[in-house]
UniProtKB/Swiss-Prot annotation:
This is Small ribosomal subunit protein bS20. Belongs to the bacterial ribosomal protein bS20 family. Keywords: Ribonucleoprotein, Ribosomal protein, RNA-binding, rRNA-binding. The gene is rpsT. Gene3D superfamilies: Ribosomal protein S20. The keyword Transmembrane does not apply. Binds directly to 16S ribosomal RNA. Transmembrane segments: none annotated. NCBIfam families: S20. It holds the Pfam family Ribosomal_S20p. GO terms for molecular function: small ribosomal subunit rRNA binding; structural constituent of ribosome.
Length: 85
């Protein structure tokens, strides 16, 4: 444990941010999974794809994912969506 007051605060802040990022990343994974399931079943594909791309863009904007990772995931979802049509 740190002894300096500012270091103690940094530990608390980092724990809080880690928890928040974990929650956001989990929600993102769920959204992507729902999009993939929608593509397989063929129901509400455009809505699911829109939600997934929006979530990926938000995650990239908040530095939860790297922007290139988000772009790659969006590209792969779009490719799967077009292949399913």
């Amino acid at each position: 444990m740190p002894n300096i007051k500012s270091a103690i605060k940094r530990v608390k802040v980092n724990e809080a941010k880690t928890l928040e990022n974990t929650i956001r990343k989990s929600a993102l994974k769920t959204t992507i999974k729902k999009c993939k399931e929608a593509i397989v079943t063929g129901e509400n594909t455009s809505d699911a794809y829109t939600a997934a791309t929006k979530a990926l863009d938000k995650a990239a904007a908040k530095n939860i994912l790297h922007k290139n990772t988000a772009a790659r995931k969006k590209s792969r979802l779009a490719k799967a969506l077009n292949a399913a049509k």
